């Protein structure tokens, strides 16, 4: 048995099994994410939300997914059929692909590569192609305008996200997500995590993540009052389901990145309590709760306001922060205290 597992076929089967586990976790989480999002939104609006299908409405998401899958796929006249159907698949696959390098605990990662942050950033950046392809292939003005908005918005806020991540890389000296979490380990629990020395960047990362995932109040590419449903107007059935699933998976990915980069990942916030997967999942769930609350209580921005904030506020501030972190780390200002603190020392 040991010889087989060390053989080429054994390694391939092991990687395939691990990949299926990651996909299973993402898909099961997706069911609860949609359910939780709808429940939180309903609670803010003093409604009950899903409560009929299954206990407490837990099976409502399953019923909705089945409804989408078995619906007829309506293809409008004049669309580019290959590109039209390829677009949602690209968005979904890229959203799932990024989870291959997300560690949940020491050893609980599909591929613990040294350029994990770069891999995640590349996969999330490529998702914009699915949106652009879907809007262009639909042969309709509303999807096309929505896709153009989405492309401009995602590219604008990816710059800020990249600069924020560079600050973390400078502090850690590594692009490996496991190493970044290990650098935040210390005797003071949550006060060793990067949220404290990089506090301004936590807020910027959260807001940029909202814009990057087209989440309210930055859901301009699919603003109902302006573009109906944006680039998704002409989609129905399974293709629409893939777009929606990719969006929620990308949101949960941003929650995972916030947990890993700023809040210690699987590390316990209280010294003495054991570290583990529980803390990682709990932090991700908390950040998704914040995403859902923002959706429920913050009004939508105008498109010009969104772009102005991204280029005139977030970009210069995050760039200045990178310069500051690099200066403090290089010249060991304040006797090296800040550098050792920011580097987990």
Curated annotation (Swiss-Prot):
Its EC number is 7.1.1.-. The keyword Nucleotide-binding does not apply. The chain crosses the membrane at residues 11-31, 50-70, 84-104, 115-135, 161-181, 187-207, 248-268, 277-297, 309-329. It is found in: Cell inner membrane. It catalyses: a quinone + NADH + 5 H(+)(in) = a quinol + NAD(+) + 4 H(+)(out). Coiled coil: none annotated. GO terms for molecular function: NADH dehydrogenase activity; oxidoreductase activity, acting on NAD(P)H, quinone or similar compound as acceptor; quinone binding. It comes from the Bacteria. The keyword Methyltransferase does not apply. It is a multi-pass membrane protein. Keywords: Cell inner membrane, Cell membrane, Membrane, NAD, Quinone, Translocase, Transmembrane, Transmembrane helix, Ubiquinone. One of its GO terms (cellular component) is plasma membrane. One of its GO terms (biological process) is aerobic respiration. InterPro entries: NADH_UbQ_OxRdtase_su1/FPO, NADH_UbQ_OxRdtase_su1_CS. Belongs to the complex I subunit 1 family. NDH-1 shuttles electrons from NADH, via FMN and iron-sulfur (Fe-S) centers, to quinones in the respiratory chain. The immediate electron acceptor for the enzyme in this species is believed to be ubiquinone. Couples the redox reaction to proton translocation (for every two electrons transferred, four hydrogen ions are translocated across the cytoplasmic membrane), and thus conserves the redox energy in a proton gradient. This subunit may bind ubiquinone. NDH-1 is composed of 14 different subunits. Subunits NuoA, H, J, K, L, M, N constitute the membrane sector of the complex. This is NADH-quinone oxidoreductase subunit H 1. It comes from Cereibacter sphaeroides (strain ATCC 17023 / DSM 158 / JCM 6121 / CCUG 31486 / LMG 2827 / NBRC 12203 / NCIMB 8253 / ATH 2.4.1.) (Rhodobacter sphaeroides).
């Amino acid at each position: 048995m040991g010889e087989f597992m060390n053989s080429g076929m054994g390694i391939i089967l092991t990687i395939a099994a691990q990949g299926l586990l990651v996909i299973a976790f993402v898909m099961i989480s997706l069911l609860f994410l949609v359910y939780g999002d709808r429940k939180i939104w309903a609670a803010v609006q003093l409604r009950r939300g899903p409560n009929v299908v299954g206990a407490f409405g837990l099976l409502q998401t399953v019923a909705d997914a089945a409804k989408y899958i078995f619906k007829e796929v309506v293809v409008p006249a004049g669309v580019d059929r290959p590109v039209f159907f390829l677009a949602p698949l690209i968005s979904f696959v890229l959203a799932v692909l990024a989870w291959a390098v997300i560690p949940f605990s020491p050893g609980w990662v599909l591929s613990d590569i040294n350029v994990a942050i770069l891999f995640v950033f590349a996969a999330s950046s490529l998702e914009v192609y699915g949106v652009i392809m879907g809007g262009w292939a639909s042969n309709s003005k509303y999807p096309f305008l929505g896709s153009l908005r989405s492309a401009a918005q995602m590219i604008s806020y990816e710059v800020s996200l990249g600069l924020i991540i560079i600050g973390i890389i400078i502090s850690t000296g590594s692009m490996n997500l496991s190493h970044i979490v290990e650098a935040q380990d210390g005797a003071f629990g949550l006060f060793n995590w990067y949220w404290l020395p990089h506090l301004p960047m936590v807020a910027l990362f959260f807001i940029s993540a909202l814009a990057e995932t087209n989440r309210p109040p930055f859901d301009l590419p699919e603003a109902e009052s302006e573009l109906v449903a944006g680039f998704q107007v002409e989609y129905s059935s399974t293709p629409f389901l893939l777009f929606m699933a990719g969006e929620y998976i990308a949101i949960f990915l941003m929650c995972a990145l916030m947990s890993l980069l700023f809040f210690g990942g699987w590390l316990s916030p209280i010294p003495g309590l054991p570290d583990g997967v529980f803390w990682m999942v709990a932090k991700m769930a908390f950040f998704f709760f914040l995403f859902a609350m923002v959706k429920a209580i913050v009004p939508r921005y105008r498109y010009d306001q969104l772009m102005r904030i991204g280029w005139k506020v977030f970009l210069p501030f995050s760039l200045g922060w990178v310069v500051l972190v690099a200066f403090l780390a290089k010249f060991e200002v304040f006797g090296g205290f800040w550098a050792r603190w920011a580097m987990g020392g």
